[in-house]
Amino acid sequence: MLHRTTIATPVGDLRVVASDAGIREIRMPLPDRSIPMPAAENPDHPILKNAHDQLDEYFRGERRAFDLPLDVEGTDFQLAVWGALVDIPYGATESYGELAQRVGRPGAARAVGGANGRNPVPIVVPCHRVIGASGAMVGYSGPSEGGIAIKRWLIRHESGGTTA
């Protein structure tokens, strides 16, 4: 059974879905993410309560990494990229090309970008820390300008530029 809750954050309401094994999805507050969620509202589920607490700590500037159980599905390549994302230090950024190099696929920056864009648990798996080779903010939770604004906010937050 899937459970969900909505968590108010400085970047908008995050909708979080969990199975009994872990977090399956975090939806960003963007218009193109308004698809109904096949899960029962259950903010008291232990995994969702833990997610709420850890996300609150993150947005208050008190947490730099998450230790939530995850229950995500993806290809082997996607899972490798998502696993490498958590190794990007808090407050740091890395280019898609650098990330491709680290997952053993030099020259696969576009494929890394595709995997990054399919990350089902943004913030917890920090895909916002990946930027273009030129330093440009490109793509975040979809192509909309709203996603780029959230990415910019998260990077600024982690560099000490803003807190909740």
What are the residue ranges of the model-derived segments?
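Basic nucleic-acid-binding alpha-helical/helix-turn surface characteristic of O6-alkylguanine DNA
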Residues: M1-G107, H157-A164
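Regulatory, non-catalytic segments
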Residues: A108-P122
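Short Lys/Arg-enriched helix C-cap and helix-to-coil transition segments
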Residues: I123-V130
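…primarily DNA-binding HTH/wHTH and HhH modules…
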Residues: A133-A164
